[in-house]
Amino acid sequence: KKEKKIKGIIHLAAQVAVTTSVINPLNDFNVNALGTLNILEAVRNYCPNARFIYSSTNKVYGLLNTVKIIEAPKRYEINKKEGISESEPLDFHSPYGCSKGCADQYVLDYARIFNLQTVSFRQSCIYGERQFGVEDQGWLAWFIIATVLGRKISIFGDGKQVRDVLYVQDLVELYEKFIEQGNNLNGKAYNVGGGLKFSLSLLEFIDILKDQGLEISYTFGDWRPGDQKVFVSDNTKVIKELGWEPKTSPVQGIQHIVSWVKKHRELLSSFMSD
């Protein structure tokens, strides 16, 4: 075998929808768990000095049954001042949570056993332009696309569920930081999101869209399996060890996507019809 000179690898490929994983759990496992193991083996054999980033998920923490959840008028809140930290017990829910969690653990173990330079970023909701969000995945982009195109939206649950949202350019800066500066961070997991400051519920998100002059039509449906009532990332560890913080507020990021969707209305109409 011949070693390749590769500086960094960012593993983003995945089956991304909880609902799809319930319909076809074997395919979900093959893509997320086995697929990640295949990539780790390739790194081990051909580029063991490359820095490897795994795009993991907050779903590895499950329904957060150990966390006290408080219901407010427009959102759920938790009794943790900074959000959910990496010390929260892992508790995979849904086939998607299991497959991503399995891959997450392999990524960390390959650092321990084979001394690879791997990290797992347990990401909350990532959003930005060029995100072709659909009902099952990419909810923030999906809401905007559907609203601009005059489509009705389904809210699964009561709309009070909360996520911290992270603009994609902020995430890219973190990836670059790790590849350039990530010394002695092998085998670590980091919660990565917008944090409490950049969190919002679905109902609060709808209010932001209305403030931007958009008319939105929606209905309510049943909760989906594995859907957390609230998840907010505690970014303390990644801030301390990599010197990174999210910069783009939800209002700013949403404005960027609304502008992009309006500019590419015809393309997105074709995508929606498919």
Question: What positions do the PLM features span?
Answer:
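Non-catalytic, hydrophobic alpha-helical segments
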Residues: L171, Y175, V192, L202-F205, ...
